Design a protein with these regions (language model features):
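Ligand-binding pockets and gating/stacking loops
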Residues: 1-335
Length: 335
């Protein structure tokens, strides 16, 4: 890694914490794109806890096989069947080995067996909802294996929407820049032949300033989010729609600067959770270290409380803010 980068997983991320609170067939699904087309899975976006990274699947064709392989045709179906056979073999092999062990080694193999049982049970649950997956699952297209980054991100949003609608997960993370050294996407599909890192350093392209370029990229992302919202809005759930019971958080690609300290970090929170969140407003908290200043952790506590978790803190407290109460939700967001 280059200076300033870290491969250390110090603790849980907010999506990992929510995954424990809102478990599903897949507690968490991470989908994204990376600079290098050959990157299949990245582990630098999400985590369930210290040194427990969560995968971000960066190839839509492979993500489709993992999520919808039980009802797929061709290669994806073959991969799903092969995965089941492999899990069955490994589970039985671990059981045989475990029976020959004692003490700490037996306990360790018991943990391995539990992991494989979890994976196999997940595959079984996918088989149980095949009708739903066939009815509401996505239809793969050339975008799923396209070398064009915008095609792949479009496909990942399609997969993510289908995963939510089919009940595969309650927690979805979509990333358009996955990988410690592979975040530097060039959005050629938007007609831009300049990478995001160069844009961040203020470079222009053709007749467009760095600000113009960022606006084009961000507008594209919001169009994708709007498409996701429309799909959720079309699904009835309870007395409303899936969108009524969903919160979407758009995290900006940058804080107060290209090489930032994250003292300011703009976010967009979409959805009101059935009226439990106050929406349609712009909120600007006082600057870092000032009276009534709040941290990103306070927003995350807000989300966890909405999900039903009894938490009043998240992550590590900022030692430079020792005189501030860093606990609790953002009351300004709660109805």
């Amino acid at each position: 890694p280059t200076p300033g980068e870290s491969r250390i997983i110090a603790g849980e991320t907010i999506d990992g914490a929510l995954a424990r609170t809102l478990p599903g067939i897949f507690p968490h699904i991470g989908l994204g794109i990376s600079k290098r087309f050959e990157n299949s899975v990245i582990y630098n976006i999400s985590a369930m806890g210290r040194n427990k990274g969560l995968p971000t699947m960066c190839r839509p064709d492979q993500a489709y096989a993992a999520l919808f392989g039980s009802v797929a045709e061709g290669t994806a179906k073959q991969e799903f069947a092969a995965r089941n056979n492999l899990l069955d073999f490994l589970r039985d092999d671990i059981k045989r080995t475990e029976s020959q062990l004692a003490g700490e080694e037996r306990a360790q193999f018991g943990a391995y067996l539990e992991s494989f049982e979890t994976l196999r049970n997940r595959q079984s649950r996918l088989n149980e909802i095949q009708h739903t997956l066939r009815e509401k699952g996505p239809v793969p297209s050339d975008k799923y294996s396209s070398p064009v980054e915008t095609d792949r991100l479009d496909a990942q949003f399609d997969l993510g929407a289908a995963a939510l609608i089919c009940g595969l997960t309650n927690v979805l993370t979509l990333s358009s820049a996955a990988g410690i050294q592979d975040f530097d996407i060039t959005f050629k599909g938007l007609g831009l032949n300049i990478d995001k890192h160069s844009i961040g350093h203020g470079k222009s392209y053709e007749d467009k300033t760095w600000s113009d370029l960022y606006n084009i990229i961000r507008r594209y992302h919001f169009d994708l989010i709007a498409g996701l919202m429309k799909k959720l809005e079309a699904v009835k759930e309870g007395d409303g729609t899936m969108l009524d019971n969903t919160v979407i958080v758009y995290l900006s690609d940058g804080a107060e600067g290209h090489h930032s300290r994250c003292w300011e970090w703009p976010m967009v929170v979409i959805g009101d959770m059935g009226g439990r969140l106050k929406s349609g407003r712009y909120i600007d908290y006082p600057g870092y270290g000032q009276k009534q200043h709040r941290t990103t952790a306070n927003l995350y506590v807000t989300l966890l409380n909405l999900a039903g978790a009894s938490r009043d803190s998240f992550g590590m407290a900022d030692p430079a803010l020792k005189d501030f109460d860093q606990h609790g939700p953002l009351n300004e967001l709660l109805a």
